[in-house]
């Protein structure tokens, strides 16, 4: 039975975000389904028009999800008892727009969205276009880390490493998103409509970490 050494290598990559993704949610509620649907659609149209007017392409705003559910509200009757009463159909569009993380782009997009009158819920995330390169860099560093540790331990024991016997790796690939948060209360939307009030942000780098386990023969 050959002597072996098994080492877990850890690799990291520190990546600067180059892509901004804005996720929006707009909707409308009405007891008449057609009215609810039309009102929600009008908000989407207003968003597209505002973003196009700000210089973004006509197909920049994409629909990621459309849903319809029913809403009920608690009504107290004359006897003091509560009952559920139909409040209407709630039609909701979930949308995304992504663009390069360059000076002025975020400010331009938020200003356009805020001035559209659609009053969407907004979340902003900072990520990267080329995720493959980020994962590859982390994996390469993990392999180098494992080999360096194996060579150090073998040398300290008066031996050296030989043939690579096995590699054990679980491909987990977490989302590559900067920890920087961009939060905006609904009350701030009218203020954000003024371009001068929207700050440009330099987000924190994205830290990618991965691990791989290697087994070598000891000679």
Residue ranges and their predicted role:
Residues 1-219:
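Short, charge-dense linear interaction motifs
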């Amino acid at each position: 039975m050959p002597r072996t050494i098994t080492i877990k290598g850890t690799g990291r990559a520190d990546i600067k975000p180059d892509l901004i993704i804005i996720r929006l949610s707009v909707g409308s509620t009405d007891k008449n389904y057609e009215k609810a649907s039309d009102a929600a659609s009008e908000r989407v149209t207003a968003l597209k028009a505002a973003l196009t007017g700000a210089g973004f392409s006509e197909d920049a705003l994409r629909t990621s999800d459309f849903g319809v559910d029913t809403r009920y509200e608690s009504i107290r009757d004359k006897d003091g008892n509560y009952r559920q009463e139909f409040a209407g159909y709630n039609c909701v569009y979930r949308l995304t727009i992504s663009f390069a993380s360059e000076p002025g782009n975020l400010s331009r997009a938020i200003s356009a969205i805020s001035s559209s009158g659609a009053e969407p819920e907004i979340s902003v995330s900072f990520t990267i276009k080329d995720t493959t390169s980020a994962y590859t860099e982390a994996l390469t560093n993990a392999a180098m880390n494992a080999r360096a540790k194996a060579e150090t331990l073998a040398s300290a024991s008066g031996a050296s490493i030989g043939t690579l016997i096995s590699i054990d790796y679980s491909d987990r690939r977490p989302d590559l998103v900067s920890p920087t948060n961009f939060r905006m209360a609904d009350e701030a939307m009218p203020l954000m409509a003024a371009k001068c009030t929207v700050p440009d942000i330099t987000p924190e780098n994205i830290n990618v970490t991965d691990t791989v386990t290697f087994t070598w023969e000891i000679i």
